[in-house]
Amino acid sequence: PGLMQRALALPGYYDGWGAYAAELAVLWQDRFDQAAALMRLYDAMAPGVLMRAICSIKVNYEGLERGELQEYLSMYGLGEDAHVDFFFDAAVNEPFAAFPQALGYAQLADLMRSLSADLGAAYREDEALAQYLSYGPAYGDLLRERMDVWADAQVDKG
């Protein structure tokens, strides 16, 4: 894993699980239309987590100024001054605030996709998540290694 994944491993474990659990709550509920509920969740998650992380990279790594960030955000319908002020101020004042959740969610979602592909019909998300949670908090590469061993044992069980 990269430096950022190692540096944010433990906060990413907690925050990533929180984001993934919110997604599961929507997927497993049956009170509301699932597609509509997912859209609302992703609409909230995209600007709240992912766009904050992206804007922080744009400002702090690429060196974008406020006007340049406004141009970038306009491509996503977020070019109004209030949005730009929010994202720019967050990037300057809290440059790493959104990274643990964004990276943690991405790592956990990737791990679950990999396990699903490896286990095929034997994949049970609830069992995989219970096993994942029993190992953590831990660094991503260690979690993946342990989950691979667990997946191999599931295949051996048949």
Label the predicted regions.
Residues 23-93:
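Long, amphipathic alpha-helical stalk/connector segments used for oligomerization, subunit docking
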Residues 11-27:
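An active-site-proximal "capping" alpha-helix that borders the catalytic cofactor pocket
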Residues 77-158:
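C-terminal, non-catalytic "cap/extension" segments appended to globular domains
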Residues 21-24, 58, 107, 131:
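Generic structural signal for bulky hydrophobic/aromatic residues embedded
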